[in-house]
């Protein structure tokens, strides 16, 4: 099951029980880093977790997010072509 990540903007309404990605950046060593936030806590002062992903030829690795509050078995993957972050629920 694919869940398109929602980007937070200054005017965006924060919805309870929803997952958001606030920032995606290229970290040291060429790794992609995504910082995920949850619902009403989705502010810069309430970071849920940050996870670096290896820059692989396969278009990015899946990264488990054990600390995210939205759902058990939630993963995200970064699309190397567009930089879009997508959520996947583990089967």
Annotate each PLM feature:
Residues 1-91:
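Surface-exposed, low-hydrophobicity beta-strand/loop segments enriched in small/polar/acidic residues
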């Amino acid at each position: 099951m694919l869940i398109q990540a929602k980007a937070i903007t200054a005017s965006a309404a924060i919805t309870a029980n929803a997952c958001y990605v606030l920032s995606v950046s290229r970290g040291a060593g060429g790794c992609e880093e995504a910082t995920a936030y949850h619902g009403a806590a989705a502010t810069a002062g309430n970071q849920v977790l940050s996870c670096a992903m290896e820059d692989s030829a396969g278009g990015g690795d899946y990264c488990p997010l054990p600390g995210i509050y939205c759902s058990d078995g939630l993963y995200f993957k970064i699309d190397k072509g567009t930089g879009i972050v997508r959520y996947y629920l583990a089967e």
